[in-house]
Amino acid sequence: MTRHSTDGLGHRQAIRALALPALIRLVSEIADNGPINRRRGSLQAAFGNLTANQLGHAIDRARDFGLVYGDEHERVRYRLTDSGEDLADVYDTAARWARTHQFPAATSDFVTRVQHTLPLLGQDPALARDVARVGTSGGLLLPGGAVLSPQATSALDGPQAALTAWLQANVSLQHDMALHTARTADEMETAA
C-alpha cells in the first residue's frame, strides 16, 4: 500500500476547514447542479435545510478559500472556481470510498460520509502499518471504537491521493484555511 503524506499541522487544519458540512453542501450543490443565479429565492431553494447563518458562513469560507466567485452585477451569483471544481471531485471520491465501505455507517448521507472521511485521509501514514495489529478484526481502530477493515484502509489510497493532490495544488490556501480554522475555533469557544 502506498500512502501519500498529508501530515503536518497546516494540512490537518486545512482538512478540518474543508470538512465543514455547509461548505461540503455548497461546493457539491454547485458542482452537481451548476451555478446559483440571482433569482429571488434561488439560494433558499437550493439550501432550504441550512440556516441563513450556516449558509452565510459556508459562502464566506468558500470565497475566502477561492472556491467560489461571482459578481453582484452578473446574473449568476455563485459559481465554482477551478479549485472549487477540483475540490468537488475530492468530495465525490471520498464519498464513494465511504459508501463502498459503509463509513461512518451504512445509511450515512453524502455530507456525513465526506465529513468523516476527510480526517481519515489526513492521518499519519504510520497508522497504515499498524492496521494488522490494531482492532479486534485486524483492522484500524478509529476514535469512537469503530474498526476499519484492512481492505477499507488499503482503499483509502485513492481518496488520499486526490486530497493530497488538491492540497499541493492549493498550498497557498492552506495558510488562510489554518487562520480561519483557528478563528472559528476561538469564536466557538467564546460563544460556549
Language-model regions, residue ranges each:
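Amphipathic alpha-helical dimerization/coiled-coil segments
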Residues: D89-T190
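A short, conserved structural fragment
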Residues: R63-H73
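Long, low-complexity hydrophobic alpha-helices enriched in A/L/V/I and glycine
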Residues: N37, G56, D71-E74
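Short, hydrophobic-biased segments on the C-terminal half of alpha helices
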Residues: G56-R63, V76
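C-terminal regulatory/effector modules of DNA-binding transcriptional regulators
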Residues: I30, A191-A192
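Long, low-complexity, charged/polar intrinsically disordered regions in eukaryotic proteins
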Residues: M1-H11
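Basic, amphipathic "hinge/linker" alpha-helix immediately C-terminal to the N-terminal HTH DNA-binding motif
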Residues: H73-W97
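N-terminal helix-turn-helix DNA-binding core of bacterial DNA-binding proteins
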Residues: L9-Q54
